[in-house]
From Swiss-Prot:
The protein's name: Glutathione peroxidase 3
Gene3D superfamilies: Glutaredoxin
Physiological role: Protects cells and enzymes from oxidative damage, by catalyzing the reduction of hydrogen peroxide, lipid peroxides and organic hydroperoxide, by glutathione.
Stored SUPFAM superfamilies: Thioredoxin-like
Gene behind the chain: Gpx3
Length: 226
């Protein structure tokens, strides 16, 4: 009887969303802080070929999904899903931006000029070409982290309590808000303010559902205000 009651309680908690995440208390996503000063439009980055500096204010009025990517990661196949996400939600104002990084397991070892050929012929392979903008390889954590990543991380709580195995993480100093692994994601709203942050293992399909849900809520609020 006690076992049945325990199972019933756990099921109720799971359905209500109250069961704590496993493996070090991960959360599939976190909501970003309100009231942070500044916007993402104060920053920008060089494209992967180094030929153009793109100020992020170029994307004003759109939803921007920031993703730190890697070519030789167990999650590299997310590139395929990100292409599909860009194609599906692009007409609704979503822009995906990818930022190669070699700080997690040394899984982006090549030069900038080697990354696109690697994606095309190795992983995901099969002639794959990203349909979203990639930028120059750089750090997302540590002393030399790109400033816009400092802004994003300070705007949103981390998705996991633990950073991971120090032997596979290549930066110093380590901080609580640091990105945990390749393919962590941040969504920034049309006003340049961060909205959500996703754990790297959260599926792209779940990310899509979260984005669509948020877009619908904002559309409903806008309709009421008219």
């Amino acid at each position: 009887m006690a076992r049945i009651l325990r199972a019933s309680c756990l099921l109720s908690l799971l359905l209500a969303g109250f069961v704590p995440p496993g493996r070090g208390q991960e959360k599939s996503k976190t909501d970003c802080h309100g009231g942070m000063s500044g916007t993402i439009y104060e920053y920008g980055a060089l494209t992967i070929d180094g030929e153009e500096y793109i100020p992020f204010k170029q994307y004003a009025g759109k939803y921007i999904l920031f993703v730190n990517v890697a070519s030789y990661u167990g999650l590299t196949d997310q590139y395929l899903e990100l292409n599909a996400l860009q194609e599906e939600l692009g007409p609704f104002g979503l822009v995906i931006l990818g930022f190669p990084c070699n700080q997690f397991g040394k899984q982006e070892p090549g030069e900038n000029s080697e990354i696109l050929p690697s994606l095309k012929y190795v992983r995901p392979g099969g002639g794959f070409v990203p349909n979203f903008q990639l930028f120059e390889k750089g750090d997302v954590n540590g002393e030399k982290e790109q400033k816009f990543y400092t802004f994003l991380k300070n705007s949103c709580p981390p998705t996991a309590e633990l950073l991971g195995s120090p032997g596979r993480l290549f930066w110093e100093p380590m901080k609580i808000h640091d990105i945990r692994w390749n393919f962590e994601k941040f969504l920034v709203g049309p006003d340049g303010i961060p909205i959500m942050r996703w754990y790297h293992r959260t599926t792209v399909s779940n990310v899509k559902m979260d984005i669509l849900s948020y877009m619908r809520r904002q559309a409903a609020l806008g309709a009421r205000g008219k």
